[in-house]
């Protein structure tokens, strides 16, 4: 009888594991294929060969790229080369990506940039916030951008127990930001278990020199984050839940959920079109291809435009889609004056004139 009970319990456990694996495949959209939506006047950006996970563009047309991200278990085309920050002047006729110099004293060898955000202070000082994973740890670096020298002056490294697995960031002050944690744990194995068990322990944290606090939680895997043009709302992408959350920002910097937009793709980073307030989303149509890399069946790319996200039925349009033959694993799309930049997790980056 004891053996029969043991076999029964083992069978239940295997059934539970099987159900969880099936659920994970569904969260990864493992069977989805994408139909191409091409754009004219596009070319790959020279000098970006191993990913440009995030892009942020200043009002004057200077675009910043975080390049060379490496994550445990994720493919890399340049595994031994440290990451960096590139800049492109979109006001120029034929813009090129140039790497910014970083001030002495900053550890360039372990630089592993992820999400980025800019903040312009009242005196026109430009700060660049960078999520960094040196040796796969979690920090936020604050730089001052020195335009005349094409350089970044490192000001501060931020570490905190409430920032265990930082993914993206939106700056709201010279030393103030909201950040997403895509996992509750920092250990790679515990992260895997957290994802496999679908625990929904990811969150959003507000950081200031005076206060650090969790302001939203219950996400499957909180990823991209941005702010509305009127600064009233925070947008958060939940990549494995295929959702964009709209959260209302309060004077004490707390957030309350206003609505959730469900999509049929894995939503990564979010950018705002400054001319319209529309949200541009870099997406992964098939997450399994992203994490299990096959050069003969590479991950595809998809960019969505979301108009009027606050209304009952926002308009969602596919701006660009590719099966991986041109661009693999799109993670971000940013626009400036009818010029579109599309970055990827670990592949190339695309420049298009709309």
Curated annotation (Swiss-Prot):
Glycans are attached at residues 254, 269, 323. It comes from the Eukaryota. It is an enzyme of class 3 (hydrolase). Ca(2+) 2 binds at residues 54, 116, 168. Disulfide bonds join 42-352. Capable of hydrolyzing lactones and a number of aromatic carboxylic acid esters. This is Serum paraoxonase/arylesterase 2. The gene is PON2.
């Amino acid at each position: 009888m004891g053996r029969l009970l043991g076999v029964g319990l083992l069978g239940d456990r295997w059934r539970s594991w099987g159900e969880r694996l099936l659920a994970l495949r569904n969260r990864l959209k493992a069977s989805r294929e994408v139909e191409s939506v091409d754009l004219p006047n596009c070319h790959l950006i020279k000098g970006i060969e191993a990913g440009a996970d995030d892009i942020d563009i200043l009002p004057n047309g200077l675009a910043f790229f975080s390049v060379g991200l490496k994550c445990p278990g994720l493919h890399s085309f340049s595994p031994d080369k440290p990451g960096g920050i590139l800049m492109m002047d979109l006001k120029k006729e034929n813009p090129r990506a140039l790497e910014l110099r970083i001030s002495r004293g900053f550890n360039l060898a372990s630089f592993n940039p992820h999400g980025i955000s800019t903040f312009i202070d009242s005196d026109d000082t430009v700060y660049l916030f960078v999520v960094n994973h040196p040796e796969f740890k979690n920090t936020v670096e604050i730089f001052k951008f020195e335009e005349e020298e094409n350089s970044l002056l490192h000001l501060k490294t931020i570490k905190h127990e409430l920032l265990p697995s930082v993914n993206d960031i939106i700056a709201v002050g010279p030393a103030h930001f909201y950040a997403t944690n895509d996992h509750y744990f920092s250990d790679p194995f515990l992260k895997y278990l957290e994802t496999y068990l679908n625990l929904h322990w990811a969150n959003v944290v507000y950081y200031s020199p005076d206060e650090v606090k969790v302001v939203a939680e219950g996400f499957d895997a909180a990823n991209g984050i941005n702010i509305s043009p009127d600064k009233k709302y925070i947008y958060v992408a939940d990549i494995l839940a295929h959702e964009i959350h709209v959260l209302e920002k309060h004077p004490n910097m707390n957030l309350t959920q206003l609505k959730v937009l469900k999509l049929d793709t894995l939503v990564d980073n979010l950018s705002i079109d400054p001319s319209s307030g529309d949200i541009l989303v870099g997406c992964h149509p098939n997450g399994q291809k992203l994490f299990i890399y096959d050069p003969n069946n590479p991950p595809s790319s998809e960019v969505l435009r979301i108009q009027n996200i606050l209304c009952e039925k926002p308009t969602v349009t596919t701006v660009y889609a590719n099966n991986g033959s041109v661009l693999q694993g799109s993670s971000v799309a940013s626009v400036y004056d009818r010029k579109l930049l599309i970055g990827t997790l670990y592949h190339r980056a695309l420049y298009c004139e709309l």
